[in-house]
Amino acid sequence: VNLNIKTQKAFGSWPSPISAELITRAAPGLNCLQSHDDSLFWVESRPWEGGRNVIMCRQADGTIKDLLPKPYSHSSRVHEYGGMAYALSDESLYFVNASDQRIYKTDLSGEGEPLAITGLSLQRFADLIIDRNNQRLIAVCEEHGGKNSGEQEPENYLVAISLNNENLSV
């Protein structure tokens, strides 16, 4: 290769492996990594699905699967920016759904429809953790509108939700 040969071309006419399409192509975002048993879990943000956030699982055998069927999307709006909005028990995934801020439960197999374990309310949930000793889900709860109609600021407190009967206590 002769490095002394110089070639001149007009601005913008050099061929490049980097195209505008390559730069602007939607790429998934990955965050909220957790390990559980022999599997890895993470949240995948999908721009090509309108920004839907899907909880993913990579099993010990290398199988990767979505755990949230459409239209469910993982996201919390507690403190306006959210927090860890999913937790794993031995058989179940608990997650906050973006559209209604309710906590849902679904099977770790990814089969079946998620079931809401909290009602429609002014409450938002984040930072979910499983308390295995007491069989409950602990979460930060943010209530908008407050218990008194004149309150402007959200009220924040911890809640415990029984994994056996889904009763919520403050």
Q: Model-found features: residue ranges?
A:
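Short loop/turn segments that connect beta-strands within the blades of beta-propeller domains
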Residues: 36, 51, 60, 89-90, ...
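Hydrophobic alpha-helical membrane-insertion signals
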Residues: 17-18, 22-59
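Short, solvent-exposed loop/turn segments that connect beta-strands within catalytic domains
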Residues: 49-50, 135, 166-167
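A flexible loop/linker signature enriched in serine peptidases of the S9 family
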Residues: 44-54, 74-80, 95-103, 118-125, ...
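Multi-bladed beta-propeller domains
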Residues: 2-29, 59-82, 106-124, 152, ...
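Conserved beta-propeller blade repeats
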Residues: 25-39, 73-93, 122-137, 146
